[in-house]
A protein has these predicted regions:
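An amphipathic, aromatic/His-enriched active-site/gating alpha helix that lines ligand/cofactor pockets
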Residues: 184
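Acidic, low-complexity Ser/Thr/Gly/Pro-rich repeat segments typical of extracellular/periplasmic
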Residues: 1-157, 161-175, 187-193, 199, ...
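Extracellular interaction modules
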Residues: 200-207
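Acidic carboxylate motifs that coordinate Ca2+ or other divalent cations, activating on Asp/Glu
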Residues: 181
C-alpha cells in the first residue's frame, strides 16, 4: 500500500534577502522551502560561514523556514558565504538539498576569486572533518590561536574549493579537526601548510597540500584545555606522559602550582 516513495530534494522557494544580495546590512536572513525541513542538530558544526563570524549566529529551522540571526555587526565591503553541505533535509523522507550555499555582500560587489586544489595524505583516506583554512594574519603559528578567515571542507577525494575570496595575501593550512573548533590544538590532529604566503590576485586552480602528524618533542600543555571541575584540574598535553600517579606531587603557592 502507499504511493511511490518521494525522492525529490527540497526546493528553496524564496529568501530575504535574495541569494547574492549586495549592500546587505540587516541582522537576519530568512529562507523558505517548499516543505517542512528537519531541524539542524548542531548548527555550529553543520554550517560553515566564511569569512568567520564571531559570535556564531543563531541558526534554526522551524517547519519550512530557516533563519540566520547575526549577533554582531558584519565586516564592511565583504562577501559572506554560508555553506550547508548535505545538512538540509526534508522532514518526511530525509531527501537532501546538497551543497546549498547562500551568498551576500556588505559591499557593492561579490568577491569572485577562487582557490582550488587537493589535500594528500599517507593514510588510506582523508580523515573526516578535514578543512582548508585561510588566514589574513601573517604569523606562521596563527592556526594555533585564532579561527580562520576563510574555510572550506575537504571532500573525500581530497579536493577542496575556497570560493568568493577577496584579493590579498594569506597563510594557508589544512587541518584534520578532531574537536570541531578549527584550531590546531590536539596532538592527534594532522596538519598541512604552504611554506610561504599565498598571494591571491587571480584564481588558483592547483594548490596542493600534504597532511602530516607533527612530531613535537617538547612537552606542551594546550592552553585551551586547562579546565577545573569539582576541584580537579584537567590538562591536555601534546604527548603521552610516562610517570605514574604516585610520582607526581604539587605544591600550591597563591595562584601558582609548583610540580617538582
Amino acid at each position: 500500500t502507499g504511493g511511490k516513495k518521494d525522492t525529490t530534494p527540497p526546493i528553496v522557494k524564496s529568501s530575504y534577502p535574495t541569494n547574492a544580495q549586495l549592500n546587505f546590512h540587516q541582522k537576519q536572513i530568512t529562507i523558505h522551502f517548499n516543505e517542512w525541513m528537519q531541524p539542524l542538530t548542531n548548527p555550529k558544526a553543520q554550517v560553515i560561514i566564511s569569512p568567520n563570524v564571531e559570535p556564531f549566529p543563531k541558526i534554526e529551522i522551524i517547519k519550512n523556514e530557516l533563519s540566520i540571526k547575526f549577533k554582531d555587526t558584519l565586516q564592511p565591503n565583504t562577501t559572506y558565504s554560508i555553506y550547508f553541505g548535505d545538512n538540509l533535509k526534508d522532514n518526511n523522507e530525509g531527501n537532501t538539498l546538497s551543497n546549498y550555499k547562500f551568498l551576500f555582500s556588505t559591499g557593492s560587489f561579490i568577491d569572485s576569486l577562487n582557490v582550488k586544489g587537493s589535500v594528500q595524505t599517507a593514510l588510506d583516506k582523508i580523515p573526516d572533518n578535514t578543512f582548508v583554512l585561510l588566514y589574513k594574519e601573517k604569523e606562521d603559528s596563527v592556526f594555533t590561536k585564532k579561527r580562520p578567515f576563510y574555510i572550506s571542507k575537504v571532500q573525500t577525494d581530497g579536493s577542496f574549493s575556497l570560493e568568493n575570496i577577496k584579493d590579498g595575501a594569506y597563510r594557508i593550512y589544512a587541518l584534520s579537526d578532531k574537536n570541531g573548533n578549527y584550531y590546531y590544538d590536539l596532538p592527534t590532529e594532522s596538519i598541512a601548510f604552504s611554506d610561504s604566503l599565498t598571494h591571491v590576485s587571480s584564481n588558483i586552480d592547483s594548490l596542493n597540500l600534504e597532511l602530516f602528524l607533527p612530531e613535537d618533542t617538547t612537552l606542551r600543555i594546550f592552553e585551551k584545555d586547562k579546565t577545573i571541575k569539582g576541584g580537579i584540574l584537567h590538562l591536555t598535553f601534546n604527548k603521552e606522559l610516562s610517570f605514574s600517579k604516585d610520582e607526581l606531587t604539587a605544591t600550591i603557592i597563591g595562584n601558582d602550582a609548583i610540580i617538582p
